């Protein structure tokens, strides 16, 4: 592994500060403007926050939670907790009061950082359940209620500076006492069923991830990333430890609605996202080209054809020459450059994780001269375990295992992982831990996949999501759902169902932006999303997409019928997890009446 090695995430952070104290560390938005801070400035606030937590009586190993969107203060709070010898529990701002209380109680959190007055008020709704939480720390503004339970982050840091002055050298002793096997993070997997489980991740887990990314040799201090993923999730957290380890300048804003505007200002060289983000970009570009019609659309199709030929050449290690090179330069000027400009104009590559990326979408971006590297991991493996590299990639796969990660395919096709990134276990759940984690270190991912002759891993589906038809045929729905989303840019979500049933159907939601634009341009008036979903012309448009995908499938895999839902799936309806994964069982239960119309009494018997 890369040198130097560290005993804790905080020690790694201290090394970064000592190496490049006055270099830009990260930036965030305040009043609509970006404000940057150096590593030295970041350290001052981390030490103040850590001192403040120690003044509150936080003991080694105790949990402090963060209930906030991704922003520089999230990183400062996290590092402050770790420097005080504690461990961070993460909560999404989209969690309800009851869900937040569950995590705070289950993780035994003593302190909770809250983003704003709204999150403060949310926890006050369930204060009677939170007797063990001694302090809320408000990141934005001053407390609305002057009862001492909530103090501002500014006040915490003021107290911390005073505590550090009164106890010289004590904070450094606390930091030095933190070791690699100590708990660093409790991340609660929302899952698609049941209560969330606290995944215990140690300092060594995160150090392994940081070292692994450093070993790839693809990032450095000249890079700039735009981090919009939730830092409450392992994918976001691994980006945090990577930018600390490598000195990558990081602009942080968790507001996904500002992503396009932020790209234009930040102009990142690298960015990581979930497939949903890339699907939305794809939908906008493709529908815009189609609606341009005539010559514009023909030029777009020609450019994609040229880009596709160059992509296939590059995938085998070649480069365009002669006429193809000239055509590619022209296509870049006419088409690709516009997409790249939307993404800031400086991207070297994108990273995709958290859910399967449609091969068609990866190939589309590459045809437009934008490389998306798909990677794979789980919260239980500290996120990054397998990935494609800029110099070695295959679309439709998640790449090859990172150094220090072992992979094995079980007899039933389940992917097993082993290595330093694997969790310690589930917090206070020994039986669940024993079920997922073998005594010799192999972790059962719950994903089905296979390794090809070159060692590239392909994910077929979640083990629990595999559909087994009434005729005994196995179907991997995520692959088919991804094909449909790529074939029909007017679709937002596809939920394919058919387990133990005679045929497959799909519950589909519209991409209101692209579908609404198409409707208006075709003279179709509608009141709202629900009204739009009832329009026959839209139904025919979606059916055409389904028929195009069905033409590539075996008979038992085909979608025989579909229904356009009157709403998009969301966390608010309980149909999506915070990382935007579909909760199939919830969707199925919420729309049982629709399924009964498809299957008659079949549903009632299941």
Segments from the language model and where they lie:
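Conserved ATP-binding/catalytic segment of the ANL
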Residues: 401-469
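Gly/Ser/Thr-rich phosphate-binding loop
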Residues: 151-153, 269-272, 284-393, 406, ...
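Conserved AMP-binding/adenylate-forming core of the ANL superfamily
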Residues: 2-5, 25-79, 96-101, 152-160, ...
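Conserved AMP-binding A3 loop
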Residues: 36-40, 176, 184-210
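Conserved pre-ATP/AMP-binding loop-to-beta segment of ANL
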Residues: 21-24, 150, 157, 161-188, ...
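Conserved AMP-binding/adenylation subdomain of ANL enzymes
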Residues: 207-224, 231-336
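Conserved structural elements of the adenylate-forming
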Residues: 43-48, 180, 199-220, 337
């Amino acid at each position: 592994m890369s040198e130097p090695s560290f005993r804790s995430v905080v020690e790694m952070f201290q090394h970064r500060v000592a190496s490049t104290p006055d270099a830009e560390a990260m930036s965030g938005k305040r009043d609509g403007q970006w404000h940057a801070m150096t590593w030295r400035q970041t350290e001052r606030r981390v030490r103040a926050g850590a001192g403040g937590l120690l003044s509150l009586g936080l003991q080694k190993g105790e949990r402090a939670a963060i209930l906030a969107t991704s922003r520089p203060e999230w990183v400062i709070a996290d590092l402050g907790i770790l420097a005080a010898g504690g461990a961070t529990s993460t909560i999404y701002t989209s969690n309800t009061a009851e869900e937040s209380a569950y995590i705070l109680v289950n993780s035994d959190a003593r302190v909770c950082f809250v983003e704003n007055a709204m999150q403060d008020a949310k926890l006050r709704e369930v204060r009677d359940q939170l007797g063990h939480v001694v302090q809320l720390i408000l990141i934005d503004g001053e407390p609305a209620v002057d009862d001492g339970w909530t103090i501002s982050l500014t006040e915490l840091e003021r107290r911390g500076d005073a505590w550090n002055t009164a106890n010289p050298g004590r904070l450094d002793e606390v930091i030095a006492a933190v070791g690699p096997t100590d708990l660093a993070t409790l991340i609660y997997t929302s899952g698609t069923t049941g209560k969330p489980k606290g995944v215990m991740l140690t300092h060594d887990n995160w150090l392994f991830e940081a070292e692994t990314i450093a070993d790839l040799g693809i990032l450095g201090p000249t890079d700039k990333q735009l981090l919009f993923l939730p830092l409450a999730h392992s994918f976001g957290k691994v980006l945090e430890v990577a930018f600390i380890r490598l000195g990558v300048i990081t602009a942080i804003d968790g507001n996904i609605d500002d992503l396009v505007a932020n790209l234009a200002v930040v102009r990142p060289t690298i960015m990581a996202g979930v497939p949903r983000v890339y699907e939305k970009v794809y939908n906008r570009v493709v529908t815009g080209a189609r609606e341009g019609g005539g010559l514009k659309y023909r030029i777009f199709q020609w450019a994609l054809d040229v880009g596709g030929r160059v992509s296939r050449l590059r995938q085998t290690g070649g480069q365009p020459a002669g006429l193809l090179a000239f055509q590619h330069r022209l296509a870049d000027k006419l088409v690709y450059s516009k997409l790249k400009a939307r993404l800031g104009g400086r991207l070297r590559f994108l990273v995709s994780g958290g859910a399967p990326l449609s091969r068609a979408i990866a190939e589309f971006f590459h045809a437009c001269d934008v490389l998306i590297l798909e990677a794979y991991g789980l919260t239980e493996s500290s996120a990054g375990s397998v990935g494609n590299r800029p110099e070695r990639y295959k679309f439709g796969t998640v790449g090859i295992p990172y150094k220090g990660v072992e992979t094995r395919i079980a007899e039933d096709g389940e992917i097993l992982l082993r290595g330093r990134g694997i969790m310690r276990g589930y917090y206070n759940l020994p039986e669940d831990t024993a079920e997922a984690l073998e005594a010799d270190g192999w972790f059962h991912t719950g994903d089905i996949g296979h390794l090809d002759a070159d060692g590239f891993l392909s994910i077929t589906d979640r083990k629990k999501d595999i559909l087994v038809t009434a005729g005994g045929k196995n179907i991997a729905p995520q692959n088919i759902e991804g094909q449909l989303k790529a074939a029909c840019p007017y679709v937002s979500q596809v939920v394919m169902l058919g387990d133990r049933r005679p045929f497959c159907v799909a519950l589909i939601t519209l991409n209101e932006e692209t579908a609404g634009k198409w409707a208006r341009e075709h003279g179709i008036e509608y009141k709202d999303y629900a009204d739009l979903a009832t329009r026959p012309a839209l139904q025919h448009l979606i059916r055409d997409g389904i028929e195009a995908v069905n033409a590539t499938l075996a008979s038992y895999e085909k979608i025989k019928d579909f229904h356009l839902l009157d709403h998009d799936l969301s966390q608010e309806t309980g149909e999506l997890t915070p990382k935007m994964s579909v909760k199939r069982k919830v969707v199925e239960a919420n729309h049982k009446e629709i399924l009964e119309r498809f299957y008659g009494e079949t549903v009632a018997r299941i």
